[in-house]
Amino acid sequence: MASALRRLVEQQQWRYLVSQSTRSPKLIHGFFSFSSKTNPNPNKQQQILIDYISKSLQSNDTWETLSTKFSSIDLSDSLIETILLRFKNPETAKQALSFFHWSSHTRNLRHGIKSYALTIHILVKARLLIDARALIESSLLNSPPDSDLVDSLLDTYEISSSTPLVFDLLVQCYAKIRYLELGFDVFKRLCDCGFTLSVITLNTLIHYSSKSKIDDLVWRIYECAIDKRIYPNEITIRIMIQVLCKEGRLKEVVDLLDRICGKRCLPSVIVNTSLVFRVLEEMRIEESMSLLKRLLMKNMVVDTIGYSIVVYAKAKEGDLVSARKVFDEMLQRGFSANSFVYTVFVRVCCEKGDVKEAERLLSEMEESGVSPYDETFNCLIGGFARFGWEEKGLEYCEVMVTRGLMPSCSAFNEMVKSVSKIENVNRANEILTKSIDKGFVPDEHTYSHLIRGFIEGNDIDQALKLFYEMEYRKMSPGFEVFRSLIVGLCTCGKVEAGEKYLKIMKKRLIEPNADIYDALIKAFQKIGDKTNADRVYNEMISVR
């Protein structure tokens, strides 16, 4: 009898609320109006309405029944949020989802970002992950630009008694809809807020970044993960190895580690070493050392690599004294010297012009049983060439070729550029021939420097041979090659040949300069051909 009476009273109160809503909305304006804030202290009328809707949902009323009962009610944001929180427990999460969709579809209501956040929290806690992902994606794709789902999820995290998994799903959804930079920003922000995201989230973010060919972003994400103590698994490492392959850097890193360790390293060591060197190359020395320390603590790189990287970092900063101290400590602790570390010292000495010290280090290196490699010799060749030791540069280039190593194109070009004596030009040309037979690929600058050297040494025939060798190799001679040839031909009295190459030059749309015209004019004047000298002069004036 008492329960029947209580139901009758509630029905009468409900009829009163509905009639008031229909006749005079202003009387309950604070309840039914749209509001972005949840009312923390709903009045009695509001409470009755909330209770009534909640009971209907608990009874699993159909959408049609709900629409019939509440057709005249104006659902505010605060009302929706309060009702959703009534169903925040896992066992009632489906009612929360039903109410969210009913209010959206039947009432044609555009939910606020806070309603989305509350519903997502409730669904994740109940492990209704497919529905949660769908709502996250819908919110990210359809919400106004000024709405921030991250803020709303953080603001409603405690009140909804949620779980950190919600933030993993959020970042994963950002990745899947290709909002990759935004997803990374959210990833960093959540880590800064104290949430530890899962390695699955890390893998999802780097996987989609890699598929989108944003390799730089992949490395930034991986670096951030290590910094925030989110450590990779086998899948992470597999993705990162694929990225190294796509970048064409895998062999480079593997070779580097072979020189440091003398043996092949695990894929995880390859990836982590590559990360530290990448950060170092960006001159972020402090960050690289912090990363290295963390990797060493987790045994994600070996000590030999750690010491070698620290030596490299100190040398990169120009602090050779500290670099040498670290190297000595490395040896004292029983680690072997390696070709990479020695080459670091050789490079710095060559850059500073202390080529004799670089040569001494090479001797020390070989006496220690450590074999120099191509980069060691490239540094020496470039150093000797830059600082006027052309014979020494040629000597080390010959040593390289004899040992079956190949000079880099840049080092070879620097050496050829420095030679001045004709005998050294011939020597350089012989080295080029041997190197080409072994697979060396010269560029235009290689031929340009040699052609200039032969012309300055009055060997025009050899210069012309190199010109036609360029043509045979499908290399297009540039301005410097034509300038050297034409000026050289004119200087040795072959003005007709000089004019022939001027015509070829212009036919290839390469503009001659004043030096070329002056050489032709002087050559014609020298043989008394005033007519052609005037013609070339007039042409020079017209093109200016």
From Swiss-Prot:
The UniProt entry, under InterPro entries, shows: Pentatricopeptide_rpt (IPR002885), TPR-like_helical_dom_sf (IPR011990)
Keyword Repeat in record:
yes
Q: Which Cys pairs are S-S linked?
A: none
Alphabetically ordered keywords of this record:
Mitochondrion, Repeat, Transit peptide
- Spell out the PROSITE patterns in the cross-references: PPR
Q: Name one GO biological process term.
A: mitochondrial RNA processing
The record's GO CC annotations read:
mitochondrion
- The record's principal subcellular location, in a coarse class, is mitochondrion
Residues in PPR repeats: 163-197, 198-232, 233-267, 268-302, 303-337, 338-372, 373-407, 408-442, 443-477, 478-512, 513-544
Q: Does the keyword Transmembrane apply?
A: no
List the Pfam families: PPR (PF01535), PPR_2 (PF13041)
**UniProt-annotated location(s):** Mitochondrion
| Transit peptide location | 1-116
Question: NCBIfam families recorded for this chain?
Answer: PPR
Protein family (similarity comment) = Belongs to the PPR family. P subfamily.
Name of the molecule in the record = Pentatricopeptide repeat-containing protein At1g66345, mitochondrial
